[in-house]
């Protein structure tokens, strides 16, 4: 050190080594500094870079030890950065010498804060914004606490146990197969409560609750009716629910945009309607008016024709129809109430099963089965009542479905010939339901006309009914095959 200090004013190498020693003396020995200086071919800047690189590789524990707590200001020289070839055109700011204190602070945090960073004015390239995936973001403590609270009280069970429990709970009266139950459980993540709600929504009992048609009764009424399997429809509803929401959302946005454009175009190209004043009526005063014959009118004329009041006699079947309708509504109300109670019990059973309360879950399932059976019985009663009403209404008819034939002015043979002609014309036509034969008043030929007509109908095996005490005969012609009539032309 004495040699370097004595010759610092004469030898440039000694001055360079003195600068390096003052800068890196706390990190390296004199031999290391001299070796780096020789390696850099007596270039102070390159030697400073070599020593800086070596200082970054050394462990930080060597920086904690300090020789003295007090410090005196020294001149620190930070070497300039060698510019790269690709940034040769950019302007580089060279650092200046800063007078700082090397004391206890620098021994703890290092001397890197004394080294200034080069600032480049090189143009920056445009880059795309960073895409952040929500799955990569770590969960916060609040999320973890909420998840911990939501998972409290739930016991993880094997998928087979969950599937067996749901099959047992929904087995009686449930139309879906076990494969559908397995797939719905997979979609819902084997959550007992969600799977139960989804399967109850897809069940046939819930589907026909508001319509009043059950599978058992419909199979008795219409044996040719083939019930289509709803398993594929259920799975399509589950898989396409998200896609349907997306499609409807985009369609609504597109319709709103088209409507806005249409309103703008109409406002631009449609002008206001032209206002036209009504012609003023000019009155001429002082002119003579022709004389008016007759008397002046003081009140409006009276209508000599009085309004005819038609009193409609209420049918005797009205009260019976009202009773049937009230009974049908009562059955439908009972079906809805029993189904709601069954669903509540099934939901409570699913929640108890997820918490590990197996015995309580089975008791709730039994109660749900009881109310489900009650709902099916009420459903069957309502459907039976509806079928009885339809069968009674089948005998009724509209006036446009009836063809009336008046036999009052005809003799027995002429009436019989006219009836045969009408039966040939109107038989087998669905738009004409009945043929009304009016025999007229009970005169001398009334019995003979009725005798010939009844004999013809019985001979052709045609059903008929009487009305108004035998004065009217109703024949159901839409069910008659005209080819089977014996008097029809071959």
From Swiss-Prot:
GO annotation, cellular component aspect: cytoplasmic ribonucleoprotein granule; cytosol
SMART domains for the chain: DUF1771 (SM01162)
UniProt GO BP: defense response; ta-siRNA processing
- Source taxon at top rank: Eukaryota
InterPro entries referenced in this protein's UniProt entry, alphabetically: At5g58720/SDE5-like_UBA-like, DUF1771
What keywords is this UniProt entry annotated with?
A: Plant defense, RNA-mediated gene silencing
Instruction: Give the phenotype of cells or organisms lacking this gene.
Output: Elongated and curled downward leaves. Upon infection, over-accumulation of cucumber mosaic virus (CMV) RNA and enhanced susceptibility to CMV.
Identify one Pfam family in the record. DUF1771
Q: PANTHER family annotated for this entry?
A: NUCLEAR RNA EXPORT FACTOR SDE5-RELATED
This molecule's function is given as: Involved in sense transgene post-transcriptional gene silencing (S-PTGS). Not involved in repeat-induced transgene silencing (IR-PTGS). Essential component of the trans-acting short interfering RNA (tasiRNA) pathway. Required for the production of tasiRNAs. Acts together with RDR6 in generating double-stranded RNA from specific single-stranded RNAs. May be involved in the transport of RNA molecules that are converted into a double-stranded form by RDR6. Involved in virus-induced silencing. Not involved in the biogenesis of microRNAs and 24 nt siRNAs produced by DCL3.
Name of the protein this chain belongs to:
Putative nuclear RNA export factor SDE5
